[in-house]
Curated annotation (Swiss-Prot):
InterPro entries: ACP_syn_III_C (IPR013747), ACP_syn_III_N (IPR013751), FabH (IPR004655), Thiolase-like (IPR016039). It comes from Listeria welshimeri serovar 6b (strain ATCC 35897 / DSM 20650 / CCUG 15529 / CIP 8149 / NCTC 11857 / SLCC 5334 / V8). HAMAP family: FabH (MF_01815). GO terms for cellular component: cytoplasm. Disulfide bonds: none annotated. This is Beta-ketoacyl-[acyl-carrier-protein] synthase III.
């Protein structure tokens, strides 16, 4: 028995903030943003719309798509950096709102790599037989911690949530390998400043991301006994098109094997990889027996990579 994906779901706020909107808010341009990041627009949550609202909507859809009910869920794991409070956790809030009376809940925090940490954590519970059905959510409302006076970072971030239901699958499907890591010495390069807004040293973060995402991708391939050409789809953290393209080139993959959503969502941190995965499923980019590589990096500094073989 292995742990695989049974259903997916997403939620993005209605409001779209385009690069042209940002031109009216700060000294920037659509051309400057697109050429450096690949971002054209991002979603922004309402003031009265919170991270747990985004997570709830995505989880609800994922459970329905898995053909399950909330009472079938044993555990909720939410990856986020924008909890409204230290406690209760976002996972506990959505567990209550969904009426999932049989489920436990906990949040995990590894910034933009958080979803990969959540997936790997869920897989361990399933593979040991401790739990059967686990909802893993990546959700963030980055607009509330964005410094809108810093054009270098304000143009990057958006809000949203992606969710999956994980459960038992056959031994030759599901999670084939993973690589999680941290380099705490780099925490000074990406963090919340004294005003609780995002600070980023873009140059240092770029170097870290390109190096670690590439190396982690090669490690999970080796651990899964796969070659680069065995990969059917690469879903990287949607931070910056240049970082994403560097990851693709490191693996010698053709352009069509790179999943891109950065243009329409921007960088949504914990939900970035999850949203891209859900879009890939909805667009028919993933079919049974496909080998899918998820890889990301985040504040901490952290990184996570994993390979899933699609299907049951």
């Amino acid at each position: 028995m292995n742990a695989g994906i049974l259903g997916v779901g997403k939620y993005v706020p209605e409001r779209i903030l385009t690069n042209f909107d940002l031109e009216k808010m700060m000294e920037t341009s659509d051309e400057w943003i697109r050429t450096r990041t690949g971002i054209e627009e991002r979603r922004i949550a309402r003031d009265d719309e919170y991270t747990h609202d985004l997570a709830y909507e995505a989880a609800k859809v994922a459970i329905e798509n898995a053909g399950l009910t909330p009472n079938d869920i044993d555990l909720f794991i939410v990856a986020t950096v924008t909890q409204e409070a230290t406690f209760p956790s976002v996972a506990n809030i959505i567990q209550d709102r969904l009426g999932a009376k049989n489920a436990a809940g906990m949040d995990v925090e590894a910034a933009c790599a958080g979803f990969t940490f959540g997936v790997v954590t869920a897989a361990q519970f399933i593979k040991t037989g401790a739990y059967k059905n686990i909802v893993v959510v990546g959700a963030d409302k980055l607009s509330k911690i964005t410094n809108w006076d810093d054009r270098a970072t304000a143009v990057l971030f958006g809000d949203g949530a992606g969710a999956i239901v994980m459960g038992p699958v056959s031994d030759d499907h599901g999670l084939l390998s993973f690589d999680l890591g941290s380099d705490g010495s780099g925490g000074k390069y990406l963090n919340l400043d004294e005003n609780k807004k995002i600070y980023m040293n873009g140059r240092e973060v770029f170097r870290f991301a390109v190096r670690q995402m590439g190396e982690a991708s090669l490690r999970v391939l080796e651990r899964a006994g796969l070659e680069k050409e065995d990969l059917d789809l690469l879903i990287p953290h949607q931070a910056n098109i240049r970082i994403m393209e560097a990851s693709r080139e490191r693996l010698n993959l053709p352009e069509e094997k790179l999943m891109k959503t950065v243009h329409k969502y921007g960088n949504t941190s914990s939900s970035s990889i999850a949203l891209a995965l859900v879009d890939a499923v909805e667009e028919g980019r993933i079919k049974d027996n496909d080998n899918v590589l998820l890889v990301g990096f985040g504040g901490g500094l952290t990184w996570g990579a994993l390979i899933i073989r699609w299907g049951k």
